[in-house]
């Protein structure tokens, strides 16, 4: 639904007419329909807001997220307000109904998992006691052999029960936290949902060229937002893809700074006024890099040599694409999209055994995104979100965006450490994972979580299987050009990721937000 409503702005301007659009469970507003291509001035998520009808004014309605966001609106007539109330209520009900069943199942399985982990702690205490008892019997000699046999039998039984309970924990995790549930993007982030769906296609569908991938992405976006690509935008995408292919052949140091995400607004609308200027800047970068290259010899591509795409080069949004804002500000939307893009690496390591790690990573991304969508105009950078919660004295409250970002950066450090091990030539995936875990997450985990991770390590794939999973086209991993391409892509990806994590580390250290809590 769309139309004009009056929105309360401030005491100076009072009620001002704005053009509102209800689409995909999100109510957004603009100055006018003609200015919609510039992007919305604000939006509110219907699934999490309250709809209140004014007790006196029969043309007024209020949309409220308590403590976060307030929309005071007036319709031009009672009948028009009624139409909006029906549309807003229906959007809220549909979103709630579709999520209720899955959320209920998710909550039940989470509680079951917590219960099993409590049992694990109990069995651990019993094991410690029984080991001490066994030591006592051993030191007293063999005079009471019958008691020694009983203690040994009891210890063996407890060990078996402990392992069985641990196995049940993994079964619950496998049954509860499937890929579909983990990838479920919170309503209100259409761009992230679009990016997520295209990432899932890459390991399965061979993509012959970059243009074909972009058209597939556009189709996905249009399916959810009811848009059409016009001729000008199609030409723009073709030109940009030809530039990308040319840049890969000339110089590996060129990153795709002119990512198509820069031309997509929060509501999925394409910004047109900067398109040709971006192409000119990109072309200038290509000309300059052709004469001033600083790549290593093995990274350079001779003209005509095969360029094989990898998982990292086909990402729609990558950490290497992110341009920092003023004062090293990390753009929130681009960062979260890049986090979603790297999550499939855990699937390639084992979608079942790494489900708890993946669940934690995606859950933290969603928590930060939920904070972001409450006020996209204000929370343009991660720093602004953290500082807002610091000033409100809620930064260290459980489930806050600041806490979620803390665990998110820890999880990203683990992935970065693992990929660094692989890039440096480690051929044993178990060793690479263990080294990365020991340097990053291990210090923050208790013995139960460490045990689960140790169990997951045993199911890690071989180096050949993991590398094969990073290909876009089946069989590419057997080519020498693919190994060179992996080195090239990781040499761009990992330093950019490290730089942004270092900025977040500094932010948390300055404000004393790091935590020694063990989970």
UniProtKB/Swiss-Prot annotation:
Task: Write down what this protein is called.
Answer: Pleckstrin homology domain-containing family A member 8
Q: What does this protein do?
A: Cargo transport protein that is required for apical transport from the Golgi complex. Transports AQP2 from the trans-Golgi network (TGN) to sites of AQP2 phosphorylation. Mediates the non-vesicular transport of glucosylceramide (GlcCer) from the trans-Golgi network (TGN) to the plasma membrane and plays a pivotal role in the synthesis of complex glycosphingolipids. Binding of both phosphatidylinositol 4-phosphate (PIP) and ARF1 are essential for the GlcCer transfer ability.
The main location is Golgi
Alphabetized GO MF terms? ceramide 1-phosphate binding; ceramide 1-phosphate transfer activity; ceramide binding; glycolipid binding; glycolipid transfer activity; phosphatidylinositol-4-phosphate binding
Q: Biological process GO annotation list?
A: ceramide transport; ER to Golgi ceramide transport; intermembrane lipid transfer; lipid transport; protein transport
Return the InterPro entries for the record: GLTP_sf (IPR036497), Glycolipid_transfer_prot_dom (IPR014830), PH-like_dom_sf (IPR011993), PH_domain (IPR001849)
The impact of changing residue 18 to L is: Abolishes binding to phosphatylinositol 4-phosphate, less association with Golgi and no preference for TGN location
Q: Which residues form the PH domain?
A: 1-93
Annotated source species: Homo sapiens (Human)
- Modification Phosphothreonine, positions: 139, 153
């Amino acid at each position: 639904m769309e139309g004009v409503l009056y929105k309360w702005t401030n005491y100076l301007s009072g009620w001002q007419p704005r053009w509102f659009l209800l689409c995909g469970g999100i109510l957004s507003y603009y100055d006018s329909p003609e200015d919609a291509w510039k992007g919305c001035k604000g939006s509110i998520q219907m699934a999490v807001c309250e709809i209140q009808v004014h007790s006196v004014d029969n043309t007024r309605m209020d949309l409220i997220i308590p403590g976060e966001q307030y929309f005071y609106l007036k319709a031009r007539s009672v009948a028009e307000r009624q139409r909006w109330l029906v549309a807003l209520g229906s959007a809220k009900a549909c979103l709630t109904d579709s999520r209720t069943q899955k959320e209920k199942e998710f909550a039940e399985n989470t509680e079951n998992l917590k219960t099993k982990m409590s049992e694990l702690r109990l069995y651990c205490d019993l094991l410690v006691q029984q080991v001490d008892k066994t030591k006592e019997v051993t030191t007293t000699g063999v005079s009471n052999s019958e008691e020694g046999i009983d203690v040994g039998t009891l210890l063996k039984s407890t060990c078996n029960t402990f392992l069985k309970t641990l196995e049940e924990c993994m079964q619950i995790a496998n049954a509860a936290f499937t890929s579909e549930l983990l990838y479920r993007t919170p309503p209100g982030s259409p761009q992230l949902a679009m990016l997520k769906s295209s990432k899932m296609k890459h390991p399965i569908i061979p993509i012959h060229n970059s243009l074909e991938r972009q058209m597939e992405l556009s189709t996905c976006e249009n399916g959810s937002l009811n848009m059409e690509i016009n001729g000008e935008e199609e030409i723009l995408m073709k030109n940009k893809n030809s530039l990308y292919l040319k840049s890969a052949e000339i110089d590996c140091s060129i990153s795709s700074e002119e990512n198509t995400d820069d031309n997509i607004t929060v509501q999925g609308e394409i910004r047109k006024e900067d398109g040709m200027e971006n192409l000119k800047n990109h072309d200038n970068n290509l000309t300059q890099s052709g004469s001033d290259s600083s790549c290593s010899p093995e990274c350079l591509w001779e003209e005509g040599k095969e360029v094989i795409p990898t998982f990292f080069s086909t990402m729609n949004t990558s950490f290497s694409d992110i341009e920092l804002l003023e004062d090293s500000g990390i753009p929130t939307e681009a960062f979260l999209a890049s986090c979603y893009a790297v999550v499939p690496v855990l699937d390639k390591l084992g979608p079942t055994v790494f489900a708890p790690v993946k669940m934690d990573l995606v859950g933290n991304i969603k928590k930060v995104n939920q904070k972001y969508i409450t006020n996209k105009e204000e929370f343009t950078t991660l720093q602004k979100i953290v500082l807002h919660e610091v000033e409100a004295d809620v930064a260290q409250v459980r489930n806050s965006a600041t806490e979620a970002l803390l665990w998110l950066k820890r999880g990203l450090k683990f992935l970065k450490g693992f990929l660094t091990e692989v890039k440096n030539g480690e051929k044993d995936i178990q060793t690479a994972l263990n080294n990365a875990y020991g340097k990053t997450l291990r210090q923050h985990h208790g013995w139960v979580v460490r045990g689960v991770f140790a169990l997951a390590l045993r199911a890690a794939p071989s180096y050949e299987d993991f590398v094969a999973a990073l290909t876009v086209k089946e069989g590419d991993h057997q080519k020498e050009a693919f190994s060179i391409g992996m080195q090239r892509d990781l040499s761009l990806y990992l330093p950019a990721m490290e730089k942004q994590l270092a900025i977040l580390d500094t932010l948390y250290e300055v404000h004393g937000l790091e935590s020694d809590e063990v989970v």
